Amino acid sequence: MSCFSCFSSKVLDNEGSSMPAPYKQPNSPKRTTGEVVAKNANGPSNNMGARIFTFRELATATKNFRQECLIGEGGFGRVYKGKLENPAQVVAVKQLDRNGLQGQREFLVEVLMLSLLHHRNLVNLIGYCADGDQRLLVYEYMPLGSLEDHLLDLEPGQKPLDWNTRIKIALGAAKGIEYLHDEADPPVIYRDLKSSNILLDPEYVAKLSDFGLAKLGPVGDTLHVSSRVMGTYGYCAPEYQRTGYLTNKSDVYSFGVVLLELISGRRVIDTMRPSHEQNLVTWALPIFRDPTRYWQLADPLLRGDYPEKSLNQAIAVAAMCLHEEPTVRPLMSDVITALSFLGASSNSSNTGSNHLQQNRSNKYQDAVQWDSSPRYANSQM
């Protein structure tokens, strides 16, 4: 039985309903993700489907990795905007820090995963470079950057995401996760779902990126895979943190955190807030149990411009995904059904009662001074 049987079966699917199968070379026997990962355990082969670049080609594309081309930076290294010459194409080039968080294994995993798995809601890997000790990945360029840029790190004067766009982004991310869980063979556990890893195309279609921590999921009668605990604090499922046991429900929990960020406009961990509000999930849990307080979770920057029913149901979805007991969490297919219904209802609903609108307005005014500082900062992919 669906976890969201209370939702209508009507599904809004602006992003296409078909789920492509894992990638395989034309005129060749079908290869599962597991078979190819095992075959390429010591390094990617030349027939992976991704283009192999020389370091010189990528240096030329990024103007020798000039600062003016830098669009993102983190523990893994730096991301540059580049332009390939043949064929002419704008790309994003991730140059891994040789002493950074993403090592040889993570580089290999990302090349293999993105060479095999193709979906509208996964970022497209164009190629890679493994010259000497240089490790670089070349992706399609995403001009809008990450969800984090538009939700948590707004530039001064930048317009916040409206409610319908937030639901659209959540739906796209959910479809990407569902593809990994249900269509890949064997299933893939993403393990690093967070707002900075969700990239946006010009139409705000969400694409999952950074697959270095992805792991092949359990097969047959196996219920979980054991793994060293990795990921980003605040997004990791509590049972995974405690035991190292990884399941697809670990990704569902992380999705619930991202959905809560989309609803609230708050960071999952924010040490600049009062102590009882610094952990987003901990702060939200008592509100989940009191529907009369749901409006308190809405992002003040929305200024009350959202359908009350859509907000309430989005919060209900987030609460299910964040359930302490993994088996109670929904499947991503159920999440997609629920969010698709929300997308449909958001386009046809009004914003609720005058009393609720006044509460929203007051909440917005109370938050203006707060949000004018912490959420307006500089950040990239």
Swiss-Prot record:
May be involved in plant defense signaling. ATP binds at I71, G72, E73, G74, G75, F76, G77, R78, V79, K94. The gene is PBL25. SMART domains: S_TKc (SM00220). The keyword Phosphoprotein applies. Residues 65-342 form the Protein kinase domain. This is Probable serine/threonine-protein kinase PBL25. Residues 16-41, 347-381 are annotated as: Disordered. GO terms for molecular function: ATP binding; protein serine kinase activity; protein serine/threonine kinase activity. It comes from Arabidopsis thaliana (Mouse-ear cress).
